[in-house]
Structures are given as structure tokens and as C-alpha cells.
Curated annotation (Swiss-Prot):
Superkingdom in the source lineage: Eukaryota
Name by which UniProt lists this protein: F-actin-capping protein subunit beta
Function summary: F-actin-capping proteins bind in a Ca(2+)-independent manner to the fast growing ends of actin filaments (barbed end) thereby blocking the exchange of subunits at these ends. Unlike other capping proteins (such as gelsolin and severin), these proteins do not sever actin filaments.
Family: Belongs to the F-actin-capping protein beta subunit family.
UniProt xrefs under PANTHER family: F-ACTIN-CAPPING PROTEIN SUBUNIT BETA (PTHR10619), F-ACTIN-CAPPING PROTEIN SUBUNIT BETA ISOFORMS 1 AND 2 (PTHR10619:SF0)
Organism for this UniProt entry: Arabidopsis thaliana (Mouse-ear cress)
GO cellular component terms, semicolon-separated: cytoplasm; F-actin capping protein complex
Modified residues (N-acetylmethionine): 1
Keywords: Acetylation, Actin capping, Actin-binding, Cytoplasm, Cytoskeleton
């Protein structure tokens, strides 16, 4: 099981679904563990009633149907489906509106969805999702890649309130893939994923949404910095070692 998870962590996000299917056929006895611990690139579905897109994941799935955060209905329709309580649904609606603003400010477009449900410990769980298409045909002013995708998954477990305090456990996963293709540099692809966790005890007087928002903003900022330093920084270092920039080569060449 550990070897399978290690392999999936090293697979490019584009190939993770194929790799997961192969592992499920090889070790079916671990299928439930693999499906619960492995994050796949996010898919999108259109809610005809609201006219908005929403993100599909295991957290809004029941059987083969997915619940829209906009209409609170399953697509395709499903009888005896699971729904959040009225109080939690109200919080979910507010979270979707606020997170859409966060998405536009940080990503300049894309698709976001928030789902909430009760857990078995008198608390609740919230899942915040963002999918950004950074290709030339994508939304937003920064779509300049041949292909590009940023998938962010933030899952927060909120414990029961004790003395006006609550425990928050945030697990964030970022999956990134990009491809450039131009005459000067040729075709280049880069992809990977990173996961981190944060735990905090915060006062509920500020509100759950405020607390969760601050945690997501802080951890996502750290993940962005890690991606920039590890993925892009190391890649830049390797490329410059193998193929130094033209100005450096000219500086090293003796005059003839």
C-alpha cells in the first residue's frame, strides 16, 4: 500500500487516473484506501438549472450522481440522496459566494465549488475546490500556455465547539500541469502535485468561514512558494546548467 501511494505521488497529474486504475486491478484489496487517499485532477459539470459549472469530486458524490452547490440537486437525479442539514446548507451557500470572490482575486477566473457535510464527531467537514484553466483558450487574462491546469483541493475538518473554541484541521493538495510550445524554446512540459496539512485552534466568535478562509489563504500561499522554489526553481537551475542563457555563453567565449 505504501509503495502504491508513493508511486501515485510521483506520477504526473495527467496520468494519475490511468495509474490508479492499474493499481486497483493489481491490489483490489486496497481499493477503498486508494480511492480515499488519492486525489485526481478535478472534473467539471454544468448545472442546467442555475446555468453555472460546478466541480466533481468524492465529497459531492452519491452513487453515480453529483450534487451541485448552486441548486443543491443531484445530477443525474437520485432518490434517497444525502444532503447537508439546513443550517449547514446555509453556511455552504455563503461559503460558495465568498470563495468565488477569493477565486477571482487570486486566480482571475476559473471555477470554484464548496461542499459541506456533517461528520460523526458533532462537527462538520468542508471541501473548497478551485480549477483554473491557464491555456490560451482558458478564462482570465493570464491564459498564455499551450496547456495548463491548476487544481486546488482544500479539506477542513472542524471539531465540535468547546469553550467558544474549535479545532480546525486543513489538508490542502495542489496539482499543477503546464505545457508550452513556441519556436524559441520548443515544447516543454512540467507537472506535479504537493500536499500539506495545518492544524489550528481558533475562536468561533469570528465565524467558521472567516477562520477557514484565513487558513486556506495562508496554506495556499505557502504551497505557491514551495511550487515556485521546488518545481520552477529546480527546473530553472537544471535548464540553465544544461543550456546556459545566450548572454552567459557570450560572456564566457573569448574574443577572436
Amino acid at each position: 500500500m505504501e509503495a502504491a501511494l508513493g508511486l501515485l505521488r510521483r506520477m504526473p497529474p495527467k496520468q494519475s487516473e490511468t495509474a490508479l486504475s492499474a493499481l486497483l486491478s493489481l491490489i483490489p484489496q486496497h481499493s477503498s484506501d486508494l480511492l480515499s487517499q488519492v486525489d485526481l485532477p478535478l472534473q467539471v459539470l454544468r448545472d442546467i438549472e442555475s446555468g453555472k459549472d460546478f466541480i466533481l469530486c468524492e465529497y459531492n458524490r452519491d452513487a453515480d450522481s453529483y450534487r451541485s452547490p448552486w441548486s443543491n440537486k443531484y445530477l443525474p437525479p437520485l432518490e434517497d440522496a444525502l444532503y447537508p442539514s439546513s443550517e449547514l446548507r446555509k453556511l455552504e451557500v455563503e461559503a460558495n459566494d465568498i470563495f468565488a470572490i477569493y477565486r477571482d482575486q487570486y486566480y482571475e477566473g476559473g471555477i470554484s465549488s464548496v461542499y459541506m457535510w456533517e461528520d460523526d464527531n458533532e462537527g462538520f467537514v468542508a471541501c473548497f475546490l478551485i480549477k483554473k484553466d491557464g491555456s490560451k483558450s482558458g478564462h482570465g487574462r493570464r491564459g498564455c500556455l499551450e496547456e495548463g491546469a491548476w487544481d486546488a483541493i482544500h479539506v477542513i475538518q472542524v471539531g465540535s465547539e468547546e469553550e467558544e473554541m474549535a479545532q480546525y484541521c486543513l489538508t490542502s493538495t495542489i496539482m499543477l500541469s503546464l505545457t508550452t510550445d513556441d519556436e524559441s524554446s520548443g515544447k516543454f512540459g512540467l507537472s506535479g502535485s504537493i500536499r500539506r496539512q495545518m492544524k489550528m485552534e481558533l475562536a468561533v466568535a469570528d465565524g467558521h468561514l472567516c477562520n477557514m478562509g484565513r487558513m486556506i489563504e495562508e496554506l495556499e500561499g505557502k504551497l505557491r512558494n514551495s511550487l515556485d522554489q521546488v518545481y520552477f526553481g529546480k527546473t530553472r537551475e537544471m535548464v540553465c546548467t544544461l543550456r546556459p542563457p545566450a548572454e552567459i555563453v557570450q560572456m564566457r567565449l573569448p574574443d577572436t
